[in-house]
Amino acid sequence: PAGRTDAGVHAWGQMIGADLPERVNLPVLMKQLNSLCGPSIAVREAVWTKPDFHARYTALWRSYRYTVLNTETPNPFMVDSAWHIIKPLKLRSMQLASDAVIGEHDFSAFCRKPKPADENDTFEHSMRRHVMNAEWRDLGEGVLRFDIRANAFCHQMVRALVGTFIEIGLSKRPPSDMRGLIVSGDRAQAAPVAPPQGLILWEVGYPADCD
């Protein structure tokens, strides 16, 4: 797969690579897979690619979306797709904070470090990522959406960022804290991760000559 997702996280644009004989009829394969996996999993497209294509390592960027429902009353139809927050959020403050994450940074303050493979594993994993876009939007009727695009994401990075943005939106910390958190590299200083159900792996970008 192009990206790994935690339990409860959704994926609209997940990409999967597989080695198949040339005789395979892709439209027929799609129908067969959808009959086996649906309705919670759906294959929306199947195409042939170059032999050296890799769903994860050929990708140039990934984008995620996180949805927040900021209303006094919960919406039963959004229980599994949004984080419901009752107290009013200051969207302007959240957007100011999101501007700070754009660019190349060490996101250790927002990443869960990989566990060592064994007691002899001393490899230091890099948490440097290049964020190309990060933006909050008000979609109306209390629905807020956060979109972020980067070359890659480390474990729980988006959920930790969203959790921190929400604390800023609730005036628990100022927008200027975001830059300081990035510089600190200290996971304990950032907010707990946001719930998984609001997050979607939305799209994965590849070079134009992949197929």
Locations of regions flagged by a protein language model:
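Structured-RNA-binding interfaces characteristic of tRNA pseudouridine synthases
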Residues: 1-211
